[in-house]
A protein has these predicted regions:
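Short aromatic/hydrophobic "clamp" motif used to bind/position activated sugar donors
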Residues: 212
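Short, acidic, metal-binding catalytic loop of nucleotide-sugar glycosyltransferases
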Residues: 144-154
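Conserved donor NDP-sugar-binding/catalytic core segment of glycosyltransferases
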Residues: 1, 219-265
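A recurrent flexible, glycine/aromatic-enriched loop bordering the glycosyltransferase active site
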Residues: 1-23, 35-37, 195-198, 261-303, ...
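Catalytic donor-sugar/metal-binding loop of nucleotide-sugar-dependent glycosyltransferases
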Residues: 36, 46-65, 88-107, 116, ...
Length: 404
């Protein structure tokens, strides 16, 4: 990808071949420092990127890197001092930037990828917005998993009732409110049909939290610290949307960030990869910047949601989240994916699939509207991935170039 701060804070993805001015190096504090031996290039890149006004990426194979047995190119664990130096370089970087962190550690089982635990200065309330229509077993699984597993200290759940018919649904609402009187409420949207954007915009009016979490009713929490992992990024002024790693019930990837332009609009990176997979160059293991996140589980500060005008209600079902993330980026914020917040997503159970002519017509209309609105950006490509990948695929397959 192009320069992405969170990627660099997770691993030295820039690696070796870099050109910069002597003036920039002097301004950044001079050449490589041998006290960071083994990760001296990483430490230098962190200092240079703190100072540089513009960083350019050339997306072409300009050189080949040798790999010999016992070298860090083949296995960094062969030289553990490199890992220690990388952690020290990151801690020094955060100190210079005035960023408070609780810990920096090697992600277990990875060849030099780092996890930063940012200090959560103020654990502000998270308002969890869940649109729902019948399918009460899915909702019960979702809500019960939140209360049973979540360790974050301050959250509220706002169930956005959307034209349910089953009496059991309303009995369940009453029971849930009785069990959680302090932080669960039900609000009723009076519109007809299904409009995910309108439902969330309506629910947001009742939110008392500093943060909004858009969450599908067909999800289930896996990791207890999921909200801490998301809030530690959403609290940062530079960050807009934060997305989680979502798994299908068969433990394959449903969402690990959205690639912009895939299939003509957008697609889920690493979709259907095994949950245990490292992904392309380890990208399923570490926090990284992405163009967009799915709104099936998306955290954002409420002030940013209001700043960009919420979800666009002309996108009733598809691409409302991608359109929202594009507008958040246009407002100057960075969107992030973290693999350390994990949930199951039993996708589209309550709404159904695009399986009839009416739904297909609506879907095509949303595709055309999105392409008309963001055509220039789609043509420019996704800086969070690489133009050498096949834009029709979500699995990081290389583009096949025609023979000249």
């Amino acid at each position: 990808p192009d320069f992405m701060l969170d990627n660099l804070r997770s691993n030295n993805y820039i690696c070796h071949l870099t050109l910069f001015s002597r003036r920039l190096m002097d301004a950044a504090g001079g050449p490589e420092r041998m006290e960071y031996n083994g990760s001296q290039d990483y430490e230098l890149f962190l200092r240079l990127t703190e100072t540089a006004r513009k960083i350019v990426h050339i997306p072409h194979a300009l050189y080949y890197w040798r790999s010999s047995p016992g070298s860090t190119a083949s296995d960094i664990s062969a030289k553990t001092y490199c890992i220690d130096a990388g952690i020290a370089a990151l801690k020094a970087h955060y100190a210079r930037c005035g960023v408070a962190v609780d810990d920096v550690s090697l992600i277990p089982g990875t060849p030099g990828y780092y996890k930063t635990d940012y200090t959560i200065d103020h654990p502000g309330r998270v308002s969890i917005l869940i649109p729902t229509c019948d399918h009460i077993r899915d909702l019960e699984t979702c809500v019960e998993s939140i209360y049973a597993r979540t360790t974050y200290p301050d959250f509220e759940i706002i169930l956005i009732e959307n034209n349910s018919k089953a009496p059991e649904t309303f009995r369940t609402y009453k029971r849930m409110q009785k069990e959680h009187p302090d932080n669960l409420k039900v609000v009723t949207w009076e519109g007809k049909g299904f409009n995910y954007s309108a439902l969330n915009n309506f629910g947001e009016k009742f939110a008392t939290g500093e943060y909004l979490l858009l969450l599908n009713n067909d999800t289930e929490v896996i990791t207890a610290a999921w909200l801490e992992e998301m809030v530690m990024y959403a609290q940062q002024k530079r960050v807009g949307c934060v997305g989680a790693k979502l798994l299908y019930p068969d433990d394959t990837i449903q969402h690990a960030g959205v690639g912009f332009g895939i299939g003509g609009v957008a697609g889920h990176l690493h979709k259907y990869y095994p949950a245990s997979s490292d992904g392309y160059m380890g990208r399923l293991n570490y926090v990284q910047d992405v163009y967009a996140d799915t709104a099936a589980c998306l955290l954002i500060r409420k002030e940013i949601y209001d700043e960009v005008g919420g979800l666009d209600e002309s996108y009733a079902v598809a691409f409302n989240d991608v359109d929202f993330c594009v507008r958040v980026r246009q407002a100057g914020y960075t969107n992030v994916f973290t693999p350390f917040a994990q949930l199951y997503h039993y996708e589209s159970k309550s709404r159904g699939m695009e399986d009839n002519p009416e739904k297909q017509k609506r879907f095509q209309g949303e595709v055309l509207r999105f392409q008309a609105r963001w055509g220039d950006l789609l043509a420019a490509g996704d800086p969070c991935t690489n133009p050498n990948f096949d834009i029709q695929r979500e699995d990081f397959s290389l583009k096949i170039l025609p023979l000249e």
